[in-house]
Amino acid sequence: MNKNTLFVLSQYLIPQHALSRLVGWFASTKIDFIKNTFIKKFAAKYDVNMDEAKIEDLEQFACFNDFFTRELKDGARPIADAKLVSPADGAVSQLGKIELGRCFQAKGRDFSVVELLGGDKDRAQPFLNGEFATIYLSPKDYHRVHMPCAGTLKETVYVPGDLFSVNPATAEGVDGLFARNERMVCMFETEHGPMAMVLVGAMIVAGIETVWSGQVCPLPKQAQVQDYTQGEIKLEKGAEMGRFKLGSTVILCFPENAVAFLDEIKAQSPLMMGQAIA
């Protein structure tokens, strides 16, 4: 049995939610010794680039979460003049065609777009033969999430779920990984038609926030749907829409023929927020 197989098996045994809550406490504590130690060790381990952060002094952050969701200096991420830009720093995990309502995850693995978007067939219908992109944010990356194009918020769906780690080993070893983990589904209307933007949680992710609701994950373990069709929450391309308090993944879904990803954007391509992707 190889190392990756053992790692995946361990994911089923670890108390995922309890561990994530414990890490969440450390990430939110304002006790100087704890938060400064935590921040400095993390920044050194992952070689975090603080030169681009508005606050460069590690001890000036009130807690680890503030460091992890740090704001960047003006101009650090220019927004490309393109149909779509990357919503986050990270790397493309997978992208391409949604085949018969399923998105490719890894060799021999895929997941249902209906399940990804909370189990509602009507919500998923526009995307069943569309395009998707899965973008993984590594620990050292900038962890605010921005709009890939201008959009008007129509609906959000909090979907409770597991908290498997998200990495190549679990992508290859856990069936339907992204449709199993806790996630926040955000449905927008855009100039390209409907867009689903899914923020996926993972083990030790202390929370997911949106700019219109604050922290939305974790919530009580039942699905929650919010209707915004009467509201006027409009966000421009490149505007912040949310953030991760520790890790994970953003998935974009578009209808058939709505967008065409650039040829140079492929699996494992590194991305910077604001970079042209379509």
Predicted regions and their residues:
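Contiguous, well-folded functional domains in the mature portion of proteins
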Residues: 1-278
